[in-house]
From Swiss-Prot:
Belongs to the SAICAR synthetase family. The lineage of its organism: Bacteria, Bacillati, Cyanobacteriota, Cyanophyceae, Synechococcales. InterPro entries: SAICAR_synt/ADE2_N, SAICAR_synt_PurC, SAICAR_synth, SAICAR_synthetase, SAICAR_synthetase_CS. CDD domains: SAICAR_synt_PurC (cd01415). It catalyses: 5-amino-1-(5-phospho-D-ribosyl)imidazole-4-carboxylate + L-aspartate + ATP = (2S)-2-[5-amino-1-(5-phospho-beta-D-ribosyl)imidazole-4-carboxamido]succinate + ADP + phosphate + 2 H(+). The gene is purC. Pathway: Purine metabolism; IMP biosynthesis via de novo pathway; 5-amino-1-(5-phospho-D-ribosyl)imidazole-4-carboxamide from 5-amino-1-(5-phospho-D-ribosyl)imidazole-4-carboxylate: step 1/2. It comes from Parasynechococcus marenigrum (strain WH8102). This is Phosphoribosylaminoimidazole-succinocarboxamide synthase. Signal peptide: none annotated.
């Protein structure tokens, strides 16, 4: 059941954003759409929206308890979330704790190599350009953020990793890497936005030694491994044990 909402403001690959009666708040609906390779691969996965919404809500509240500001205000249904309206900064911030994926394709670093301190990469958020990797000089050239804002973004991202990595270790999940999106609210405050879920994180199950069976994230969809929703459900099950009762705005 959907909450009362205003007009559709934006629809992306994984979420819809709707207006509310409050000009500084919007409702986010998590969709069942699955995409990979910049939407070249697509599918509908039943229950994906609910799982990602419920995981994200619990992790936003975990981070909030550790002083990390986010756009999250509370749940508004199984697949709905009330959030602050933010102006999204067109940078994707990726933290890498363990080498895998594009890092191993682009460098001679072996998959599974621990990275400490975590590698922080910045990507230009532009689907038409394929979200290219940026250098600091290119960030300045594009005028996306000034040096002070970039420093604040990187500090916040590392704080988030500093909370999430030991949290997931306690759940016997390795936080391999993850993507963050950040934005500015009406007051100009830098906030964590978007979501934190198996769509945006790589999780490896520490209870499994099999390189495919241990994958509990979107790589199961990318690699046609099957069991995608079972993997997402396992992540929610473990997160729920530590964060059982997220706020409800209804």
């Amino acid at each position: 059941m959907s909450p009362d909402h205003g007009e559709l403001l934006y629809e992306g690959k994984a979420k819809r954003i709707y207006a509310t009666d409050h000009p500084d708040q919007v409702l986010v609906e998590y969709k069942n759409d699955a995409t990979a390779f910049n939407a070249q691969k697509k599918a509908q996965l039943a229950d994906k929206g609910r799982l990602n919404c419920q995981i994200s809500a619990r992790l936003f509240e975990l981070l909030e308890g550790q002083g990390v500001p986010s756009h999250y205000l509370g749940l508004a249904g199984d697949t709905w979330m009330l959030v602050q309206r933010v102006e999204v900064i067109p940078l994707e911030v990726v933290l890498r704790n363990i080498a895998t994926g594009s890092l191993c394709r682009q460098t001679p670093i072996a998959e599974g190599t621990p990275i400490n301190p975590a590698l922080l990469d910045l990507y230009y958020k532009d689907d038409d350009l394929g979200d290219p990797l940026l250098t600091e000089a290119r960030v300045r050239l594009l005028g996306l953020v000034d040096d002070a804002r970039q420093s604040a973004i990187e500090q916040l991202a590392r704080r988030i990793n500093g909370v999430l990595q030991p949290f997931f270790d306690g759940l016997e999940l390795q936080l391999v890497d993850f993507k963050l999106e950040l934005g500015l609210n009406k007051a100009g405050e830098l906030l964590l936005a978007d979501e934190i879920s198996p769509d945006t994180c790589r999780f490896w199950d520490q209870r499994s030694s099999d390189t495919n069976d241990r994958i509990l994230d979107k790589d199961r969809f990318r690699k046609d491994l099957g069991g995608v929703m079972e993997a997402y459900g396992e992540v929610l099950k473990r997160v729920h044990t530590a964060c059982p009762n997220p706020r409800n705005c209804l």
